């Protein structure tokens, strides 16, 4: 008879501790994985200010023979010819239910800015980032992996 209350208590504690371990915010350092090659491309730090998320490139993973900090030659406006490391590539994202949307993402490879939405997966260990034109169906997604 006493086993039942102990089992219920143990199950309750297990659920509570597993919920504590889940991360519901994308704030932190993320490894951007190239969707074509599957190799790491960059480290991006996502921060929050006044309820909006932004992401800045902290490091590029480049071959030794490549320029280690190339400039964004295809970017327009203020980002034109700025070093890619240090560039804000994600901005204006706001919480939208369990997802994040309403912001933009810059692709330094082509200099284009896209609408963006994001969602956390695998208890906050992965971030699904989608950049698109017009509607989300017309875009591409990448999965970023949490570094810290």
What is each stretch, according to the model?
Residues 21-24:
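Boundary of Sec targeting at the N-terminus
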Residues 115-117, 122-128:
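Short, compact, well-ordered microdomains
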Residues 75-81, 128-135:
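Short aromatic-glycine motifs in intrinsically disordered, low-complexity regions
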Residues 124-126, 132-148:
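Edge beta-strand at a domain terminus
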Residues 34-116:
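Central antiparallel beta-sheet cores of small beta-barrel/beta-sandwich binding domains
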Residues 16-18:
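N-terminal signal peptide c-region/cleavage motif recognized by signal peptidases
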Residues 1-10:
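Bacterial N-terminal signal peptides that target proteins for export
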């Amino acid at each position: 008879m006493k086993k039942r209350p102990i089992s219920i208590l143990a199950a309750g504690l297990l659920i509570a501790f597993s919920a504590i371990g889940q991360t519901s915010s994308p704030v932190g350092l993320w490894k951007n994985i190239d969707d074509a090659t599957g190799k790491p491309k960059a480290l991006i730090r996502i921060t929050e200010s006044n309820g909006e998320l932004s992401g800045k490139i902290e490091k590029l993973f480049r071959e030794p023979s490549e320029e280690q900090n190339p400039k964004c030659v295809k970017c327009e406006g203020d980002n034109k010819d700025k070093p890619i490391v240090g560039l804000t590539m994600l901005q204006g994202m706001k919480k939208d239910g369990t997802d994040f949307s309403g912001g933009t993402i810059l692709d330094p490879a082509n200099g284009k800015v896209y609408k963006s939405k994001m969602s956390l997966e695998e208890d906050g260990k992965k971030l699904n980032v989608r950049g698109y034109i017009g509607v989300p169906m017309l875009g591409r997604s990448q999965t970023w992996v949490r570094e810290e």
